Swiss-Prot record:
Lipid bilayer topology: Multi-pass membrane protein
Organism annotation: Stenocranius gregalis
Name this polypeptide is given: Cytochrome b
Cofactors, names only: heme b
Gene that produces this protein: MT-CYB
Cofactor note: Binds 2 heme b groups non-covalently.
Length: 380
């Protein structure tokens, strides 16, 4: 009798995706982040579901309902902090996952890569709307500032902003619709993840050498299930240390003050994982230019397959491009730092320099380095 997992119409799909999947024998721990992102998504959906049972999306009670969850609901404080810090862990894994993709040339799997970019936008939109829900000062002013950016769109901008707000300012209608979108988007993300995996399994995984590994495949289970489990343990350990010992370390103290439209906080800034994009937005004095730069800061990733000039797929054996890559990583850390600083000298000029460097490295320097390496190795 054939094993059920190989014949059952539903189980065999899972079997081909997670059990008998032919996987390169040499993929490193950098390939763990896909499963960790899956775990983060599950944690966020579950904690979010339990929070939604007690949260009220009304401007007069939203802030109090979050306080009620933390004080009166059984383990409500744990669920709330797991959800808030779960978003941070999600973005750490996302950035490392994208960074791995750039380093090892995984962007050459174009469909998978573009699906990943769409996922990144969807997760960023979800996180932004989630940040508005507690209805603290930074929630309110963050929502006001970011939604206002749409008014930079020529002709329809102002109408569009009022349409999104559901009125003439961020108010009850805005909060209600943001809650609705924040609830539905993770399920849309789950569907997009399935498409992402579908595209990935069409080509098979990349590997650290960038060479074709068809001649040397091993089954995903037990080899990579056990390897992923180690990653899961490490992630959960870091996550629970953060949740139980430093729950507010990544949050903004201003969000413990209820939203007040009459009182603007001294420094309006988003959560840490958006600071790099916020710094790029602020470094351009023109509103529309800033919005375009903000969108392009993520959309530039879609150009990476077109900008790949090297005859080798990964950066593993390309020291010049490796140097460019690590300068880019440092540049993103600088942008993250600048995004959290006030708009004054010397932060403005540092932010502008780092923003120019960000686009220059990706669009000009890395492709040039690839061509130079081809030349040195006589690969032309």
């Amino acid at each position: 009798m054939t094993i059920m997992r190989k014949t059952h119409p539903l189980v065999k799909i899972i079997n081909h995706s997670f059990i008998d999947l032919p996987t390169p024998s040499n993929i490193s721990s950098w390939w763990n982040f896909g499963s960790l992102l899956g775990l983060c998504l599950v944690v966020q959906i579950l904690t979010g579901l339990f929070l939604a049972m007690h949260y009220t999306s009304d401007t007069s009670t939203a802030f109090s309902s979050v306080a009620h969850i933390c004080r009166d609901v059984n383990y409500g404080w744990l669920i709330r902090y797991m959800h808030a810090n779960g978003a941070s862990m999600f973005f750490i894994c996302l950035f490392l996952h994208v960074g791995r993709g750039i380093y090892y040339g995984s962007y050459n799997m174009i469909e998978t890569w573009n699906m990943g970019i769409i996922l990144l936008f969807a997760v960023m939109a979800t996180a932004f709307m989630g940040y508005v829900l507690p209805w603290g000062q930074m929630s309110f002013w963050g929502a006001t500032v970011i939604t206002n950016l749409l008014s930079a769109i020529p002709y329809i901008g102002s109408t569009l902003v009022e349409w999104i707000w559901g009125g003439f300012s961020v108010d009850k209608a805005t909060l209600t619709r943001f809650f609705a979108f924040h609830f539905i988007l993770p399920f849309i993300i789950t569907a997009l993840v399935m498409v992402h995996l579908l595209f990935l399994h069409e080509t098979g995984s990349n590997n650290p050498t960038g060479l074709n590994s068809d001649a040397d495949k091993i089954p995903f289970h037990p080899y990579y299930t056990i390897k992923d489990f180690l990653g899961v343990l490490m992630l959960l350990m870091t996550f629970m240390v953060l949740v139980l010992f430093l729950p507010d370390i990544l949050g903004d103290p201003d969000n413990y003050t209820p939203a007040n439209p009459l009182n603007t906080p001294p420094h309006i800034k988003p959560e840490w994982y958006f600071l790099f994009a916020y710094a790029i937005l602020r470094s351009i004095p023109n509103k529309l230019g800033g919005v375009l730069a903000l969108i392009l800061s993520i959309l530039v990733l879609a150009l990476m397959p077109l900008l790949h000039t090297s005859k080798q797929r990964t950066l593993a054996f390309r020291p010049i491009t490796q140097t460019m890559y690590w300068i880019l990583v440092a540049d993103l850390l600088i942008l993250t730092w600048i995004g959290g600083q006030p708009v004054e000298y010397p932060f403005i000029i540092i932010g502008q320099t780092a923003s120019i460097a960000y686009f220059t490295i990706i669009v000009i320097l890395m492709p040039m380095a690839g061509m130079i390496e081809n030349n040195i190795l006589n690969l032309d």
